[in-house]
């Protein structure tokens, strides 16, 4: 880009939040905009196409890695629809990126057991162009041959989940039937009957949950069910297999809470769950939730991966959670999740999982801030209900949080080592106008300087349900991090990174994504 265009971009970047605080239209990096905002296209996944084109003009390889990060179900954000729309756009522009398609269901290390996505992601990418289609058919054809060979040899545990995610040919959806037809015509199968026979055999061998439920067969080993299946069908399990399902959760709870030993390897899979998946039923259903459901949600919460385990030392993290009116915006088109549910779940996660002096403590804010403490011994239900009883109003007064924190610190003469090392602000970033009309970073740093304290690392965690909202900071602001999405993680990188852009490049150029090019 020319120097003139660069200058215009910077000069024309100023804006204000919906509540009047100075902010920015862009981070001044289109790839960073995609990295931090990609998830917010969940409401309108097609809208990500323009963002991908803009990012690709800046750095196409980094854009590719960013899309895989957004899709990554293990280390990234797990955004399925956004990835598919974005990847279709990128493959249309750069068909040579087809060489990375095999990594979607396989991961970059076949032995890692950590794919970026699922086999149906490949199916969703059909139709971009002939080149890409041929690559997809080739990948599926090869895996299908491997799976059938494993089935014939009786090596059931070596069969992939390909058959589960391929479309059925006898479904009621015309579009799905047409996709299935394209597949069997290009996979070397004779006809629809052959395709159905192959899928049936492989699905039966891999014990697909949905087939067993449709046959009213509840002889599950609940410890082996996929994370989304046990969450999605929990009411069916409670209704149709109540005694066994409840006994399973009772035993698991004793293991997780009391550390009791049991003969069987009892566990619950949570790899595919967001923290909000577990918190949302409590916020929405409230007092009518069953005791078994409370127990399951508590077990799932306790079993979520602890991303703080990778951090060195007992760093003092403090979560500041926005509970203002705009946080009740809903992501997606099917009432999937509200920003408030994302924020509360992430705030509680940070409060619970970090081991610093602010463990089990957090702040919520809207019109005025509320200091909240929870107890490890409480159930998830009790913790969420306790947080929900805090003061929630329409305002987004971030300044009030730092007025309260720093005034209290000065009056009590709190030593610097007992102040937060990193503050995680989880919000849609639509802050109220503040004193002297400064942007949020200027406001926060000014208050710390006036109080005589060093400003902590500031993590702005975007939980907005809307794409293209204003940004609180730009890419080069040292001592700050800009994150977005529903899944926690990467706390070691947060502490190490110097700026929003360096945080992103540390992740996208790291071992997990550097293989993509």
Regions found by a protein language model. Give the residues of each.
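Long lumenal/extracellular ectodomains of secretory and single-pass membrane proteins
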Residues: 1-342, 352-517
